[in-house]
Design a protein with these regions (language model features):
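Conserved N-terminal beta1-alpha1 strand-loop-helix module at the mouth
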Residues: 1-87, 107, 127
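Glycine-rich beta-to-alpha transition loops that act as phosphate-gripper elements at the mouths
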Residues: 20-22, 70-78, 94-97, 114-119, ...
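Hydrophobic, well-structured mid-protein blocks that either form specific transmembrane helices
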Residues: 79-121, 125
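Active-site/ligand-binding-proximal alpha/beta "capping" segment
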Residues: 98-100, 126-127, 131-155
Length: 155
């Protein structure tokens, strides 16, 4: 049930802001400005120094606002995924599919959004329980790719 409610929050958020920063403080300030500006989805990347602490602080800051959804991005392995989940991340985003990360996310009932470039990667991610596929890198694809993939490859 936890996974379903998080997926609903992601859908309701509509747009997810990817937050990067050179410092913990910069990432916190940017995240707060994003929420103050009306957005509800935050993906805090693990390129931010002390990313787990930032996630913990954001989760605590917005615990009274059930519409805000905080996730972790640029998660490269299962160990980092677990650190993010323990810190309070509600979803995990990675630039590539990793089966061990999928297993950790499934264990904790946390949505996993791997980045995939090929149809083979997408199928493996879906078979491993990925909830949403992130086309990565996005600049490679045109607007028609999603309908084409759904119609011919992933149905």
């Amino acid at each position: 049930m936890k996974r379903v409610s998080i997926l609903q929050k992601l859908e309701n958020a509509g747009v997810i802001a990817v937050v990067r920063g050179k410092t913990k403080e910069e990432a916190l300030k940017a995240s707060q400005a994003i929420v103050a500006g009306g957005m509800r989805g935050i993906e805090l990347t693990f390129t931010v120094p002390q990313a787990t602490e930032v996630i913990q602080e954001l989760v605590a800051l917005y615990q009274e606002n059930p519409d805000v959804v905080i996730g972790a991005g640029t998660v490269l392995d299962a160990t980092t995924a677990r650190l993010a989940i323990v810190a309070g991340a509600e979803y995990i985003v990675s630039p590539s599919f990793d089966e061990e990360t999928a297993k950790i996310c499934n264990l904790y009932q946390v949505p996993y959004l791997p980045g995939c470039m090929t149809i083979t990667e997408m199928k493996e991610a879906l078979k491993s329980g990925a909830d949403i596929i992130k086309l990565f890198p996005g600049s490679v694809y045109g607007p028609s790719v999603i309908s084409h993939l759904k119609r011919h490859c992933l149905s």
